[in-house]
Structure formats: C-alpha cells, structure tokens
C-alpha cells in the first residue's frame, strides 16, 4: 500500500506488468471501499468530537482556571492535527491512488513529520497527566504546592517542544523520489513516491529507537503511575469506615485527595492547635463506592485504549525491521499489505476516541460537552464553567472525583 520507510522490498516483476504490479502494490477494490468507509467514519467522528472539545475548553475560559483544561486542549489539538492532515492524504495517495505521489516533497516530509509529532505529543501528554494525577492522590500536600495551572502550561509547552525535536528526524529521512526510470534514463513521472531516503539499516535503527521512545517507555511510565494511583484508590476505599463510625485521628487521605480538600485539613490543624480534639464523620455509601471504582476503571481504560490502538501499529513497524529481505514471501508481503491498513486504522481510532476519555474523566467536562452538543442541535441550556463540579449538599459524604474537585469540608462538619 505504501512504498515508504515501512514497506518491505519485493522482487521486481516482469516489465510487461502494470506500474502498480511492478512497484509491488495491488489493493483489491473491496479493501479500498472498506477502509475508505472506516477512514471516513474515523475522520468525521474524530474531527467533530475533538473540535467540540476545543470549543468547550475555550468557551469555559471564564471559569476558574484548571489544569485539566490544558491537558484536554493539548490532546484535542494533537488529535485534530493528525486527523486533518494525515487521514485525507493517506486515503487518497495510499489507499486509492498509490502512484504517483501528488503532494510533492514538502508534503511527503510534512506528512510523516506531523504523524510523528502528534504521536509523541499524545503519548507524552497522557504520561504528564498520569503523573499529575498520581502526585495529587499520593502526595496531596505537595501537589497543592507544585501543581498549578501555570506549571501545567509550562509542562505541556515542554512536551510539545520535545515532540517537535523527536519528530524532526522523520522529516529528514523521508522524501520524494522516482522508483523507476525510462529507457532514456529519465525518471518515470508515474513512479514518483514518498519513500525513505536513507539506507534500510539506518531506517531500522531509527524505527527501533522510535518505538522505544514513542511507545514503550511512555506507556510503561503511564501504566506504572496509573497502577500506583489505582492501588491508592483501592486502599482508600478499604479504609473508609461505616456510616456510624467516627474517627478521632488525623484526617485520612480521602479528605486530602484534591486541592480544595486541603482546606479541611488546614482547619483541622488549626483546631488541634487550640487544644480541641477534632473528629470527622465519613460515610461509606453507594455514591462513594461508585466514585472510587469509576476512578480506577478510568485509569485502566486509558492505558488499555492506547495499548489496543498503538501496539499493532508499532508491532508492524518492528515486523519490517526483524524480517530479512530474503524472508519476504509473496504471502507474507500480502499479509503485511493489509496488516498495514488495519494498524493505521487503529492508530487513527485512538485520536477519534479521545473525546470519550475526556467525558469519562471529568463530570464537569461531560456536562459542558453535552450542553454544547445540544446547543448545536438547537437546544439551549445553561453552561457552567469548567472545571468546577456541581455543588453538593452539606449532608453529603466526602466524595472523591479523580479528575474534578470535591467540595471543601464546612466548619459545621468538624465536631469539637
């Protein structure tokens, strides 16, 4: 499907065959129709969902600044850039019209550069978000001091600068060239392709390093941090007493899981400094159980989505690296041809499902998202600023929202 850096060599057929056959590309019509439908669906849902996510974030600027907003914006912009540039180019020049490459040398380099840039920006943004959440859960006092919107902006700026640097080599090793020549020695215009300009050995080294840096290490870090966070959530749930229990010791981490929850801790410390014994009443009700379980499930889902969508993509690239040139049979080559299309489809699916993850990790974002979607459909509803959660009654329990902010404990809840 693609005569490029990740397309294995194939023995040259007879010169009497068609150009596509001579260049080793022959996609069946049913596959073209099927993947066109899949690409079109991914493009429509992904661009609409991520554009609406950006709209929600920008529309909520009047609200209290929150760190989640910047993470959502970074991930949505990365997904939009990937879908808007890569999907149309690949659908035209890699699915339907393999030769000649029509987007020029700059388009060739830009296509691969943007794809690598967005891949790095996405996985590094997810890793940074997981690191912030882990710190907020495990070290709430330190998180209160370190995790500010300004520092989050700087962190994400660093993520994008690093992504630019890491993706730059792809714009150097890729380029446009002619695969065939005429009888008079001039390049065959119809054989113009977007392909690799360095040796295959150099490309193999680059791919292996790229898979390690853009997938294995960031995803391992994300899984490790999310695992720590999930373990803390499970421990917190097991430590919550029954509805009739009262605790006379220092507030547990359940009260300190969010930035706003620290106000209760400070008030508790001030009460102790006056020589008064403080006691907080906490309840193990159904809503609290659901909240903790939901938080753990979301963290697992984030890792699962990127493993399912990205692992086949990188496995296919490594497949190219580890199979020698003389090991490519016609059957293996045909398998790789269609495996390429399947893995790229999954790769783009990860960008299309990011709005679903946003809605899963933040109830306030979900409310704004649905309100914006309803307004576009003609239903006018009131809009609340992101990322503030809906107010809770004073009799409710200390609820924990992994991505939102629980309410502050009131003075009336601190029994003297």
UniProtKB/Swiss-Prot annotation:
Cysteines paired by S-S bonds: 108-194
Q: Where is this protein found? A: Cell membrane
Question: Can you list the GO cellular component terms from the UniProt entry?
Answer: membrane; plasma membrane
What is stated as this protein's family in its record? Belongs to the G-protein coupled receptor 1 family. Neurotensin receptor subfamily. NTSR2 sub-subfamily.
Please describe what this protein does: Receptor for the tridecapeptide neurotensin. It is associated with G proteins that activate a phosphatidylinositol-calcium second messenger system.
Name of encoding gene: Ntsr2
- Chief location of this protein? membrane
Lipidation (S-palmitoyl cysteine) occurs at 377
Name of the protein = Neurotensin receptor type 2
Residues exposed to the Extracellular side? 1-32, 88-109, 177-217, 319-337
